């Protein structure tokens, strides 16, 4: 919808694909294989990468580092849109290990580098370098003061996205725009990713079509300083397991199908570390809190087990590790 109000849009994304484009002459490196049937070697994303730019295969060399190319493409896009509003979406391929194992080095260690022998710390530090380049690109284009920058992550640490605990959806979320966003530093306010869409719509001036339901709440009043509060609670689910969190209380791992229908209940207090939460799962005094949190869960989506297709998929969990549901309905084909 941002295009309808004059915005140009750009996506710079690193995909992990098993196949190079049909008819291509890619002669770069390949990673290993993922651990699933009929897996093939994956074209490299880091050193000597396979990069598709506007539908065309780029020619790369052993000295080319994929993340540098992706960031450079976005900086070039910024230069070409100094006089036009734009929305740029940049899902980095950092921080990820290689298909089949191994972590790449970065240009900090010299070029050409290696697709093995690096460290997660090195990749995180290189994210900082790339973000700095993007901010310098905005500054050079005279757009730093009025460009809203959102920095976040798709999920928590390795493996946690497959569990309905706080560790899955808990990620950094930083919003910056010197000429518009009120500087607050770290805050205890809650938000969830469904809030991003209405936030971008409001900032861009785009309108939501009549009858279009939104789950998220715009962050604009909070980000601009019109209010100091945003959300009372957030919720998340993976397959049949759910969680809900307020500032103080956390009910997680509620899974009546494959786990514990009661879940785990914590008093988080003012703590920021999970190790400092107080487990009150079996406390009679906590029953009113539990009831309130369970009501929130019941008013939010999860797989509709009365649907035969959904039930059959759930019953196959012991052989199929990844399941995809949208609004309680099984997504039979996943494009990414």
List each model region and its residues.
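A structural signal for well-ordered alpha-helical segments within the folded catalytic domains
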Residues: 5, 68-72, 118, 125-132, ...
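Formylglycine-dependent
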Residues: 1-85, 92-101, 121, 261-263, ...
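Histidine-centered active-site microenvironments of extracellular/periplasmic hydrolases
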Residues: 2-6, 98-101, 112, 129, ...
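Beta-strand elements within well-structured catalytic alpha/beta cores of enzymes
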Residues: 85-91, 120, 124-127, 131, ...
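Loop/turn elements at helix/coil->beta-strand transitions in domains of secreted/extracellular proteins
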Residues: 5-8, 81-88, 143-149, 170-171, ...
């Amino acid at each position: 919808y941002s295009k309808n109000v004059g915005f140009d849009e750009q996506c710079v994304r690193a995909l992990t694909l098993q196949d190079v484009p049909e008819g291509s002459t890619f002669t770069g490196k390949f990673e290993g294989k993922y651990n699933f049937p009929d897996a093939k070697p994956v074209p490299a994303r880091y050193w000597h990468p396979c990069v598709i730019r506007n539908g065309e295969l780029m020619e790369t060399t052993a000295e080319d580092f994929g993340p540098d190319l992706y960031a450079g493409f976005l900086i070039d896009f910024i230069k070409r849109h100094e006089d036009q509003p734009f929305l740029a979406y940049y899902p980095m391929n950092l921080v990820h290990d290689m298909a089949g194992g191994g972590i790449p080095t970065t240009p900090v260690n010299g070029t050409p580098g290696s697709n093995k022998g690096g460290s997660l710390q090195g990749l995180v530090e290189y994210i900082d370098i790339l973000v700095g380049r993007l901010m310098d690109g905005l500054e050079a284009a005279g757009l730093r003061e009025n460009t809203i920058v959102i920095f976040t992550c798709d999920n928590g640490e390795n493996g946690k996205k497959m569990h309905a605990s706080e560790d899955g959806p808990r990620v950094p979320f930083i919003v910056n725009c010197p000429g518009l966003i009120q500087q607050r530093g770290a805050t205890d306010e809650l938000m969830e990713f469904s809030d991003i869409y209405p936030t971008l719509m409001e900032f861009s001036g785009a309108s939501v079509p009549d009858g279009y339901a939104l789950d998220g709440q715009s962050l604009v009043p909070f980000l601009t300083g019109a209010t100091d509060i945003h959300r009372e609670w957030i919720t998340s689910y993976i397959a049949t397991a759910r969680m809900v969190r307020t500032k103080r209380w956390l009910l997680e791992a509620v899974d009546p199908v494959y786990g514990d229908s009661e879940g785990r209940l914590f008093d988080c207090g003012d703590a920021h570390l999970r190790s400092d939460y107080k487990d009150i799962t079996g406390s009679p005094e906590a029953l009113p809190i539990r009831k309130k949190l369970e009501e929130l869960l019941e008013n939010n989506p999860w797989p509709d087990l009365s649907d035969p297709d959904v039930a059959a998929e759930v019953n196959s969990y012991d052989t199929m590790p990844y399941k995809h549901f949208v609004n309680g309905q099984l997504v039979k084909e996943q494009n990414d």
